[in-house]
Amino acid sequence: MSSGRLLLGATPLGQPSDASPRLAAALATADVVAAEDTRRVRKLAKALDIRIGGRVVSLFDRVEALRVTALLDAINNGATVLVVSDAGTPVISDPGYRLVAACIDAGVSVTCLPGPSAVTTALVISGLPAEKFCFEGFAPRKGAARRAWLAELAEERRTCVFFESPRRLAACLNDAVEQLGGARPAAICRELTKVHEEVVRGSLDELAIWAAGGVLGEITVVVAGAAPHAELSSLIAQVEEFVAAGIRVKDACSEVAAAHPGVRTRQLYDAVLQSRRETGGPAQP
């Protein structure tokens, strides 16, 4: 096995002080720092009062395939190569996968210096179930492809996390309403860890209306998983039984949701109203 090694360093999403001591040490001692944006990593090093000791090279999507051979050769010759993305953990919708795969194939040591990730940060503050989740990378840019992608996720039971451009967010949420249903709970996490961090929670219907006014910044979207059809129908039936006994719809939804972990009152309430619209039942609670 080569005496060199590959390090994957997680970088802060917005606050330099979120950098780990291990990342700081690696920036100072690595023989090569392969950065998604060389300007960004130099700015981070300056904020941390660190002098990057090794050679700095670019490693963004369009050049990664061209860099793999040279970086692997350096590692095989004993170099420590540190890979960093602009923000968060390399490889997760960022450069690094090709190099990691090549190093593993070559028997090279690969390790991660763990730290910030927009995926897990958004998930844990979304208020949505986090026991099981899936990450979908960036939403497709084109409308038809995006709608097809969302349609494939319509029956996904796990909470779903994905990235979206602020300029496409409104269109994406409108497509999500169409494909997933407007009652589905979700959260829009914007500018995570930064000065203007914002988390907007609500149904997809509500979030689509909110986003129509325009959104700025780095966006991570978290959407609740689908409830099983039979289970949802059963919950709606339980609510209607409470209503028939004289309990208000909202109170009935609270009672039923409290008895079923993972079910949110608002999600159930919206589902009851949608069911009533579809079956011709009373529109108002």
UniProtKB/Swiss-Prot annotation:
It is found in: Cytoplasm. Its main location: cytoplasm. It catalyses: cytidine(1402) in 16S rRNA + S-adenosyl-L-methionine = 2'-O-methylcytidine(1402) in 16S rRNA + S-adenosyl-L-homocysteine + H(+). The keyword S-adenosyl-L-methionine applies. Pfam families: TP_methylase. It is an enzyme of class 2 (transferase). Its EC number is 2.1.1.198. GO terms for molecular function: rRNA (cytosine-2'-O-)-methyltransferase activity. GO terms for cellular component: cytoplasm. Keywords: Cytoplasm, Methyltransferase, rRNA processing, S-adenosyl-L-methionine, Transferase. PANTHER family: RIBOSOMAL RNA SMALL SUBUNIT METHYLTRANSFERASE I (PTHR46111:SF1). Belongs to the methyltransferase superfamily. RsmI family. Catalyzes the 2'-O-methylation of the ribose of cytidine 1402 (C1402) in 16S rRNA. This is Ribosomal RNA small subunit methyltransferase I. It comes from Mycobacterium tuberculosis (strain CDC 1551 / Oshkosh). The gene is rsmI.
